[in-house]
Design a protein with these regions (language model features):
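The feature marks the mature, well-folded catalytic cores of soluble enzymes
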Residues: 1-227
Length: 227
């Protein structure tokens, strides 16, 4: 017996319940395999192009900046221009994601690129989102070897690539996308982060402060590439 089975067994005993009957088990399995959909707001509905435009509008409203790419090979030059515009050094730490292996990062002069998780000493981090949520302009980040969670929180500037084909309508759709990402293994990531705009807080005297608990800048590279 696994530790999970033992724990669930103790809970059943405390509740005075025995094993699930066939009907109860079928109800539980149906809820897991085909979860019921909640009411879908208007902002989470629309054709793919409508959702993309809504994602851009909502992300911008949340103080993120958005730059559209036609090909991932454009990323180094666009990032270099963005860093120059923000008066930031041309150095970043990127996730070891397969999508980020394609560009020639040395094509831009004076561009220093390191890879992997950050220890907090990097000013700029580059990640790839699992998907984007049009309803609120939110990025969904699933932790893993190709997506270190530290890049989401420690660098002062967070740059995130998201494919246009990975823009979904609402939060329920993002969980569907996560299940697809998990595949047959059904193994959940250690963490799933929903990021809407830069980090902010107004705890002190109701004065809004960007970068209070994470990056003060969020720059999104929207890749016009079907997922």
């Amino acid at each position: 017996m696994s530790s999970r089975d033992a724990m669930l067994g103790r809970i059943r005993t405390a509740l005075g319940r025995g094993p699930l009957g066939p009907d109860e088990a079928a109800t539980v399995n149906a809820g897991l395999t085909e979860p019921a959909r909640n009411l879908v707001p208007d902002r989470a509905q629309g054709k793919p192009q409508d959702l993309i435009e809504r994602f851009i509008a909502m992300a911008t409203e949340a103080s993120a900046s958005v730059d559209r790419l036609s090909d991932i090979s454009e990323a180094p030059a666009r990032i270099s221009a963005y860093l120059a515009g923000q008066n930031l050094p041309k150095a970043l730490r990127r996730a070891e994601h397969s999508l980020l292996e394609t560009p020639d990062w040395q094509a831009c002069s004076l561009f220093s690129v390191s890879t992997g998780a950050t220890d907090g000493n990097d000013l700029v981090g580059l990640s790839v989102a699992l998907c984007g949520v049009a309803e609120t302009g939110t990025l969904v980040m699933a932790s893993g070897p190709q997506s270190p969670i530290t890049l989401n929180f420690l660098p002062d500037t967070h740059i995130v690539v998201v494919r246009a084909g990975d823009i979904v309508g609402g939060y329920e759709d993002s969980w569907d996308r996560l299940r697809q990402h998990m595949g047959a293994s059904r193994v959940m990531p250690r963490a799933v982060n929903f990021i809407t705009g830069p980090s902010r807080s107004a705890d002190i005297e109701q004065t809004l402060l960007l970068g209070a608990h994470g990056p003060r800048r969020l720059h999104i590279l929207l890749l016009d590439d079907p997922a």
